[in-house]
């Protein structure tokens, strides 16, 4: 034993300062490489490589598999498939039902600020929508429709407008009027006039194709296209009335449209109706619309969830006081309002910061991602005034919305009332929103993994040691010897105690082994 100690002491005494410099430099280099790799992996995949390997591979080898996981593996396969299908549907990009007019609103913003409110990805999705709604395979039979079919594919706005005028020079064309109303009209009044002209042409085409739809697949496709055109025109006319202050007229137009075409849910006209009814403060009709569309079998939206929360909050918000509630507890009505807020926040956690004006708003995009930042912006842009109008509603939201996150500590893995929060929202929102002047809201906030912080600290510490050893080799050699002596002191103490307890003959036999 004493021979081993003397050998170790002799080895330490023969080490030169260059050895410590090389040792610390090598350690610093290795730590730096690990840090760079960890940071790259985290930025690309959102998780720590070392942590993932530890959980996925080392934990099963060490016997860390939960029994519940093993016992439910067969039953969870179907659940995983269902959740994956749900994830795909929730990551689908939807057309914003309240989208603004390009010429009368988006372009005016660009003229004033010099900023582009729409991204190329968003406008490209709109071009695809227009080709789906406003074209069909038989467009080549009519010269005006053939021109418009090319116009919807054109990327240059001025070229699209020129093509629309060329189509109108040949004959009246509903889709040409639509394009001019959307992109050339600089005011809502001008857009409304063009949409009214489009309505006359669109109704004529719709009645004609309705009579011929059963004569073949070609006529059926024409009728489907004409139906989409007519619904789009009427919906935009209703939105023009809403923007020009004729809200009751807009509500009537929307109700008539929903009765005439009840199966065309792709336009989500009920969300336009909800916003207009809130403007009229007709809360009874708002509740009736919610009763029809806030169903477990129907897809949810921020408009549905937060409007339901607003109605529940309206019943108690004017008298709500957090101090009084903490003393006496929440009443049944207050509990219902808080639960409705928690439900809405779980569906889209980005909305409260915009409603509470903790984050600045921008113009909403033409497409939104449900449960994402884009949907939160679109909802708040039109509904903030309705929350402000209800006395105490924002105060109740401010006091209760953060409590939602206690119920869902791991939102990406398990939800409370909804499916887990989809991980694809951040990527899609960065494509939909102008990140040049808007910081995309991310949920949940990504924190740096422990291993990245650890390797960063280790890299910094070893680099500092290498620098000090290079500058003060003799002093650092003394510190290194003192550190090693201190490190081995407990071991030496234990060995001395063992030697004093065990008989010398037994210890002699053990050392010989």
UniProtKB/Swiss-Prot annotation:
Disulfide cross-links: none
Location in or out of the cell: Membrane
Pfam families, A to Z: ST7
A cellular component annotation (GO) from this entry: membrane
Membrane-spanning segments: 19-39, 448-468, 475-495
Membrane topology value: Multi-pass membrane protein
Primary subcellular site in the record, as a coarse category: membrane
Keywords: Membrane, Transmembrane, Transmembrane helix
Keyword Membrane: yes
The keyword Ligase appears for this protein: no
PANTHER family: SUPPRESSION OF TUMORIGENICITY 7 (PTHR12745), SUPPRESSOR OF TUMORIGENICITY 7 PROTEIN HOMOLOG (PTHR12745:SF12)
Recorded family membership: Belongs to the ST7 family.
Name of the protein in its database record: Suppressor of tumorigenicity 7 protein homolog
Native source organism of the sequence: Danio rerio (Zebrafish)
């Amino acid at each position: 034993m004493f021979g081993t100690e003397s050998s170790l002491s002799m080895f330490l005494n023969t080490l030169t300062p260059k050895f410590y410099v090389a040792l610390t430099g090598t350690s610093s280099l290795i730590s730096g490489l690990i840090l760079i790799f960890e940071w790259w992996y985290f930025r690309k995949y959102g998780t720590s490589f070392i942590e993932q390997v530890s959980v996925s591979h080392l934990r099963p080898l060490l016997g860390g598999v939960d029994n519940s996981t093993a016992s439910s593996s067969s039953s969870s396969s179907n659940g995983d498939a269902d959740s994956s299908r749900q994830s795909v549907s929730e990551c689908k990009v939807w057309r914003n039902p309240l989208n603004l007019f390009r010429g009368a609103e988006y372009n005016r913003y660009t003229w004033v600020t010099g900023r582009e409110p729409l991204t190329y990805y968003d406008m490209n999705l709109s071009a695809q929508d227009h080709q789906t709604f406003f074209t069909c395979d038989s467009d080549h039979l009519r010269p005006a429709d053939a021109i418009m079919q090319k116009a919807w594919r054109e990327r240059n706005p001025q070229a699209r407008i020129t093509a629309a005028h060329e189509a109108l020079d040949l004959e009246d064309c509903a889709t040409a009027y639509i394009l001019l109303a959307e992109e050339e009209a600089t005011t809502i009044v001008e857009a409304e006039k063009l949409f009214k002209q489009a309505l006359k042409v669109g109704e004529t085409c719709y009645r004609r194709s309705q009579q011929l739809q059963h004569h073949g697949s070609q006529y059926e496709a024409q009728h489907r296209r004409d139906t989409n055109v007519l619904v789009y025109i009427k919906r935009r006319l209703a939105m023009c009335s809403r923007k020009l202050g004729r809200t009751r007229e807009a509500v009537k137009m929307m109700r008539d449209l929903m009765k005439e075409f009840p199966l065309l849910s792709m336009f989500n006209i009920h969300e336009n109706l909800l916003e207009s009814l809130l403007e009229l403060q007709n809360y009874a009709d708002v509740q009736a619309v919610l009763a029809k569309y806030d169903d477990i079998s129907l897809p949810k939206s921020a408009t549905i969830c937060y409007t339901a929360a607003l109605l529940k909050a309206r019943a108690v918000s004017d008298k709500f006081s957090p101090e009084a509630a903490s003393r006496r507890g929440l009443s049944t009505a207050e509990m219902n309002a808080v639960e409705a807020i928690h439900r809405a926040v779980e569906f889209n956690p980005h909305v409260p910061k915009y409603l509470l004006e903790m984050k600045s708003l921008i113009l909403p995009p033409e497409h939104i991602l449900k449960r994402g930042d884009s949907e939160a912006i679109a909802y708040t842009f039109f509904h903030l005034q309705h929350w402000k109008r209800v006395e105490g509603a924002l105060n109740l939201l401010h006091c209760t919305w953060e409590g939602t996150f206690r119920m869902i500590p791991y939102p990406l893995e398990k939800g409370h009332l909804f499916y887990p929060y989809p991980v694809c929202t951040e990527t899609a929102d960065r494509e939909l929103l102008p990140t040049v002047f808007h910081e995309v809201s991310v949920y949940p906030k990504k924190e740096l993994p422990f291993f990245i912080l650890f390797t960063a600290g280790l890299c910094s510490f070893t680099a500092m040691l290498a620098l000090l050893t290079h500058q003060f080799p003799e002093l650092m050699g003394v510190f290194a010897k003192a550190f090693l002596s201190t490190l081995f002191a407990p071991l030496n103490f234990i060995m001395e105690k063992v030697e004093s307890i065990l008989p010398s003959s037994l210890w002699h036999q053990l050392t010989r082994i």
